[in-house]
């Protein structure tokens, strides 16, 4: 699926889904690079909740394969937003071991136009993404190689990773170039 073949998965809040071409190979490259990262590789960590940092920030050059994910994500974001030019893309890793959750939050801190997530590793029962639209809740089960895009002001969280494996995703925000 490419940027022009986006699927809207929940029409009331404009949540879109897309897939990364050759995701299996890209994800393997990212996971191999991730295994070699040290705390010094992260330029910033945020949201220390329940004993872990929920967001880990690093430079694109520190993780092989991530550039392909971000380039494809930006193409999808431009298609969703109807924005022909380049966008600013901020990104971070969300690393969830067994028992970890990610707390409810939004991404509307600055001038974000669209938020997204890409799943690198998501074993069965590793935690659904839960979206809150007023009284409605929607649970989306992550799948490696899948992107989900949604409004930055949409409250969301990740349920507990009940698998014994690692759940690794890349969070993203897109906004205008300054």
What residue spans do the PLM features occupy?
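Aromatic-acidic/polar surface patches that form glycan- and anion
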Residues: 62, 66, 109, 163
């Amino acid at each position: 699926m490419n940027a022009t073949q986006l699927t809207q998965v929940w029409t009331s809040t404009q949540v879109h889904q897309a897939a990364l071409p050759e995701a299996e190979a890209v994800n393997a490259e990212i996971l191999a690079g991730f295994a070699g990262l040290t705390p010094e590789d992260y330029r910033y960590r945020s949201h220390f909740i329940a004993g872990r940092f929920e967001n880990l920030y690093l430079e694109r050059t520190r993780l092989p394969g991530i550039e392909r994910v971000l380039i494809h994500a930006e193409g999808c974001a431009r298609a969703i937003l109807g924005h022909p030019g380049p966008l600013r893309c901020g990104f971070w890793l969300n690393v969830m071991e067994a028992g970890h959750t990610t707390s409810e939050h939004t991404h509307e801190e600055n001038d974000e136009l669209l938020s997204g997530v890409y799943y690198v590793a998501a074993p069965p029962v590793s935690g659904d993404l839960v979206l809150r639209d007023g009284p409605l809740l929607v649970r989306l089960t992550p799948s490696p190689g899948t992107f989900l895009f949604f409004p930055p002001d949409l409250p969301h969280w990740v349920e507990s990773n009940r698998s014994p494996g690692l759940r690794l995703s890349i969070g993203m925000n897109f906004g205008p170039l300054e």
